[in-house]
Structure formats: C-alpha cells, structure tokens
Amino acid sequence: MEQRVFDSHLHIIDPAHPLVENRGYLPEPFTVADYRRRVSGLGIAGGAVVSGSFQGFDQGYLIEALRALGPGFVGVTQLPADADDARILDLDRAGVRAVRFNVARGGSADLDDLERLARRIHELAGWHAEFYIDARTIDETLSRRIAALPAASIDHLGMHEDGLPALLRLVERGVKVKATGFGRVHLDPAAAVRAIVDVDPTALMVGTDLPSTRAGRPFRDDDLRVIEEAVPAKHMADVFWGNAARFYLGSDTSGRGRAE
C-alpha cells in the first residue's frame, strides 16, 4: 500500500514464553520475523502488539517483541487487578501503552475491576483501556462505564451487526474503534466503517489482527482495501495512521519505524 499504516492490532506468539490453553485452544507460533514477512509491502510503520487470552498476564514475550520491532511499536497487555505501581511503570518504560479487558475470551481482569484498574493505570502512566467484547452485550450501564473512562477503544468493530447501535453510541461519547478481525466479525465491515466515520472520523483505527487466531478466516491484504474504499479521501491518512498514532504514541508524527 502507498498509504502509511499503523497496525493497531497484532499478536506475537513466541513459544519460548508461557502460553495458557484457553477453552482447549493453543495457537501456533507467530514470531516477529513471521509478522514482518507477512506484512511486507503493506506500508506498516508502527503498531500495537496485543496480548491474547492465551498469554494471560505474561509480559516477557511482549517486552522482547517490542524490543525486536523497534520504534513506532507499542504494547497492549493484560494485568491482574492487584498489579502494583512498580510493575506498571516498568512496563510503561518497555513501551506498553494500554491495558486490555478480554471479555469475549477471558484471561484478563474482570469487568468488576474496570474503573478502578483502568483509572489507576491512566493516572499513573497515561494508558488507555481496550475491550474485546461483543457489542451486543453492552447495555446502557456498561456503555456509561466504558465511556466515562479517560480513554478507551473497542476491538474488531464490536463483533456483530446487532451491536452496531451500541458501538456507535460509544463512538459518540469519544470511544475509539479498531477496524480489525474481518474474519471473525458478523457484520459488513465496509458498512460499519462508513457508519463510524459518519459519527466521528477520528474514532476509527485499522489493523491486521494477525495471525488471526481462531478467526473464521485469516487476515487478507484486501481487508485494508475494503477500508480504503469505505473511507472518504479526506479522512484516509487519519484512519490509516493519524488516529492510532495519536492514541498510542501521542502524536501523528511519532512513528519512526520504517514502512514494511
């Protein structure tokens, strides 16, 4: 792609580090070298390495992956509710920038710990909160809780067409959304992208979701083209780079990694 891309959602699976079986599932290895080979030519110059349910609260793999990927890449991790400040600050120095609540698969802190943990981490290190959640399960009470956080995002377009109204209400309240995981969603990605951009073009971020663990199909290069065709030209640079770079790096010019 000619467009510079911030991959807001990728996984690195390093068998040298602990993996936790999740609902009978263990993923195949997907190393930094595998990732670089797969995205070669896509214009990716930065991204967010996201911890999956099968990695639990381990950050060893994440720190190594960020070191190997270099500038422009940050981490999204899962933490127990009782994680101490020193651990959080160590992870921040290593490049971690968000805490993830994996409601769909588990392996993260519970939603009961949502406000306390997310707010404490934001006040301490400036991190935002990310949610892997089926938007159909977001009632008005949970919507208010998520929207009241200092900064938050929703993975994979909220997963389901029936959850789109709830997702758009969050977008109206300032929550970001990742256009990722097209092989695992039950909706028309192009229609969802257009709806989000219509509400707030600064809310949308793109990503590969590689290596697409447990998805109905893996990421395809054409998934990015679907987004290109759905987004007005005037918003293209922000959707593919600027929105995510500001969210994760604090600036749309901070990504120093070279395009792959």
Annotated model-derived regions:
Residues H9, V39, L62, V99, ...:
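Conserved, mostly hydrophobic/aromatic
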Residues Q3-R4, E28-G46, T202, R217-E260:
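Mid-to-C-terminal alpha-helical segments outside catalytic/metal-binding sites
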Residues R36, I63-E64, V193-R194, R225:
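Active-site phosphate/pyrophosphate- and oxyanion-stabilizing loops and adjacent acidic/basic residues
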Residues G56-R136, R173-R184:
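Active-site gating/metal-coordination segments in enzymes
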Residues M1-Y61:
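An N-terminally biased module of ancient metal coordination in phosphate/nucleic-acid-related enzymes
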Residues P29-R37, D82-L91, G163, P189:
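Short, acidic/polar
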Residues L10, G52, L157, T208-L210:
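Active-site metal-binding loops of divalent metal-dependent hydrolases
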Residues L111-V206, R214:
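Catalytic pocket-lining loop regions of alpha/beta-barrel enzymes
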